[in-house]
Regions:
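Glycine-rich loop-to-alpha-helix module at the N-terminal edge of alpha/beta enzyme cores
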Residues: 7-98, 108
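Rossmann-like NAD(P) dinucleotide-binding subdomain of oxidoreductase/dehydrogenase enzymes
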Residues: 99-173
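Short, acidic, Ser/Thr-enriched surface-loop or helix-capping motifs
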Residues: 3-5
């Protein structure tokens, strides 16, 4: 990874091949079998903890976004704040995943809609919003009971690694 700020090499990272990707897909499907059974408010609590971890790491992650992507420091902080804000929104959503109940044409019969998780969600993000777009999608998917596979921009791999480390620290609890 090279910084557009000064052209310096920041770090080198490995890229995934097709075989590794297939393993990730299988792991995501296994994780989905359990994650989908968690009640939405419990999933929301996990997302709340992710938001708290992001708050604790806001400055460092903001600096990394700024340096690796080329944004100003304030824009880097703003992008991390967007992640925190969507966590807060998703936590509220986790208690609002209710459906509708409606009358049917049949006597003494009612219909209802109910939300169900769908599975693995793929998230592809561009370099210009290396972390916020991922959070916008992942946090909502997680409270809805889905799991995510993230394909970040090859120009900002360190931002995605940092986010995964922060997120993993919460999921490991």
């Amino acid at each position: 990874s090279y910084s557009p700020v000064d052209g310096n090499r920041i770090a080198s990272v490995l890229t995934s091949d097709e075989k590794t990707f297939e393993k990730v897909v299988v792991k995501s499907q296994e994780a989905f079998k359990e994650w989908r059974t968690w009640p939405a408010p419990k999933r929301g609590e996990v997302v709340r903890q992710i938001g708290e971890a992001l708050r604790q790491n806001k400055e460092d992650l903001g600096k990394l976004v700024s340096y690796e992507m080329g944004k100003s420091y304030q824009e880097g902080l703003g992008e991390v704040q967007e992640m925190i804000d969507i966590c807060d929104f998703a936590v509220g959503l986790s208690r609002q995943l209710h459906g509708l109940t409606m009358h049917s044409e049949r006597p003494n019969h009612r219909m209802y809609e109910q939300w169900h998780p769908i599975g693995t969600v793929g998230i592809i993000t561009a370099f210009n919003f290396p972390v916020a777009v991922w959070a916008w999608n992942a946090m909502i998917a997680w409270v809805c009971g889905d799991v995510c596979i993230w394909k970040p921009s090859e120009k900002t791999p360190l931002c995605s690694i940092a986010c995964q480390q922060i997120t993993n620290s919460v999921f490991e609890k």
